C-alpha cells in the first residue's frame, strides 16, 4: 500500500508531487531544496536547511536521518562539494555513525535558483 507523507514542518512541494511516499518499510523522499531566498544564501546554509527539512519529514513517521539508506545530491557547482560534505557529515553524525550510500551530480540549474537539492530513501524496521 502506498501512503503519502506530509508534514507542515517542512516546506510544501513547489509542484505536483508529494514530500514523501511510504511503501512498507521504505520511505522515498522527493528532492528537497532550501525554500528561502536562494540567490542570497550560501551553500552551507542551504545544505543545513535541506537536511533539517528531510529530518522533519522523517520525524513525522518516527524516523530521523539515521534511517536514510541512500541520498542523491544535485549541486550546481562541484567546487562547493567540500562545504556540502562538511555540513552533511556533521548533521548525520548527530544521529548515526553510519553514512548512507550516496550519489552526487553537478547540474546546470535547480528550481528557485537553489544551489543544491537532496533526495533520500529511508528504511525502518517495523
From Swiss-Prot:
Q: Which Pfam families match?
A: Ribonuc_L-PSP
Q: Which residues form the signal peptide?
A: none
Instruction: Quote one Gene Ontology molecular function term.
Output: deaminase activity
List the InterPro entries: RidA (IPR006056), RidA_CS (IPR019897), RutC-like_sf (IPR035959), YjgF/YER057c/UK114 (IPR006175)
Highest taxon above the source species: Bacteria
User: What intrachain disulfides are recorded?
Assistant: none
> What PROSITE patterns has UniProt attached to this entry?
UPF0076 (PS01094)
Q: Name one GO cellular component term.
A: cytosol
Q: What family, per the record? A: Belongs to the RutC family.
What is the designated name of this protein? RutC family protein bbp_334
Which source organism does the UniProt entry give? Buchnera aphidicola subsp. Baizongia pistaciae (strain Bp)
